């Protein structure tokens, strides 16, 4: 079973997260940020991962610490759940539509942290959610999961739809990249490690 649990406590947040890679897409998510809970629920569902997440953050300041710290812990938990990465597919890419919005998401479980984020034109907020935090979340995730992640918005108008297309696509690349390739023997790298 590819599963991991981690907790992280700072003066700003207290995050507890359990991730099961080979799940059914079930989730229990409590971040205190309704829109972010919705996006993480979509991530779990479309990623086919079971995600149990709670965060008590300093939302009286703003949402930044909560969103970033969840990205940190999710990245660390994914890295731990993957173990030595033997037999994984490693690479994944999807085109993710949501009504008028279309995003391209590419993923490499490379052992190298890198984010390319080309998303322009988001409104400042969706509800009470600060949309600039989407990039902060993915930067924290990529850095701590040690993956390469490319997120490109091809087009879109509605900020909710754009962000939703990104999170659904992100779930799908996690599912594909972390899946076991029965034809892959050992670590999927000529270096012998990831």
From Swiss-Prot:
Encoding gene (name): hisB
Lyase among keywords: yes
Coiled-coil positions: none
Alphabetical list of PANTHER family matching this protein: IMIDAZOLEGLYCEROL-PHOSPHATE DEHYDRATASE, IMIDAZOLEGLYCEROL-PHOSPHATE DEHYDRATASE HIS7
InterPro entries, per database record: IGPD_sf, ImidazoleglycerolP_deHydtase, ImidazoleglycerP_deHydtase_CS, Ribosomal_Su5_D2-typ_SF
Functional pathway: Amino-acid biosynthesis; L-histidine biosynthesis; L-histidine from 5-phospho-alpha-D-ribose 1-diphosphate: step 6/9
Organism of derivation: Oceanobacillus iheyensis (strain DSM 14371 / CIP 107618 / JCM 11309 / KCTC 3954 / HTE831)
Main location: cytoplasm
GO molecular function: imidazoleglycerol-phosphate dehydratase activity
Keyword presence, Aminoacyl-tRNA synthetase: no
HAMAP family, per the entry: HisB (MF_00076)
GO BP, sorted A to Z: L-histidine biosynthetic process
UniProt protein name: Imidazoleglycerol-phosphate dehydratase
Family statement: Belongs to the imidazoleglycerol-phosphate dehydratase family.
GO cellular component, one term: cytoplasm
Transmembrane segments: none
Highest classification ranks of the organism: Bacteria, Bacillati, Bacillota, Bacilli, Bacillales
Reaction equations catalysed: D-erythro-1-(imidazol-4-yl)glycerol 3-phosphate = 3-(imidazol-4-yl)-2-oxopropyl phosphate + H2O
CDD domains assigned to the protein according to its UniProt record, in alphabetical order: IGPD (cd07914)
EC number: 4.2.1.19
Record keywords: Amino-acid biosynthesis, Cytoplasm, Histidine biosynthesis, Lyase
UniProt-annotated location(s): Cytoplasm
Uppermost EC category: lyase
């Amino acid at each position: 079973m590819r599963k991991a649990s981690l907790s992280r406590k700072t003066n700003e947040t207290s995050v507890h997260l359990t991730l099961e890679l080979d799940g059914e897409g079930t989730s229990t998510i409590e971040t205190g940020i309704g829109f972010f809970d919705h996006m993480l629920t979509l991530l779990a569902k479309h990623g086919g991962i079971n995600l149990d997440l709670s965060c008590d953050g300093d939302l009286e300041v703003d949402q930044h610490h909560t969103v970033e710290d969840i990205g940190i812990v999710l990245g660390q938990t994914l890295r731990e759940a993957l173990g030595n990465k033997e037999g994984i597919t490693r690479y994944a890419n999807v085109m993710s539509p949501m009504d008028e919005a279309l995003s391209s998401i590419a993923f490499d479980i490379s052992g190298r942290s890198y984010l390319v984020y080309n998303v322009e034109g988001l409104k400042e907020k969706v509800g009470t959610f600060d949309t600039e935090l989407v990039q902060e979340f993915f930067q924290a995730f990529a850095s701590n999961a040690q993956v390469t992640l490319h997120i490109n918005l091809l087009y879109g108008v509605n900020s909710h739809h754009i962000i939703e297309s990104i999170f659904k696509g992100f779930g799908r690349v996690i599912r594909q990249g972390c899946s076991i390739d029965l034809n892959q023997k050992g670590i999927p790298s000529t270096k012998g490690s990831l």
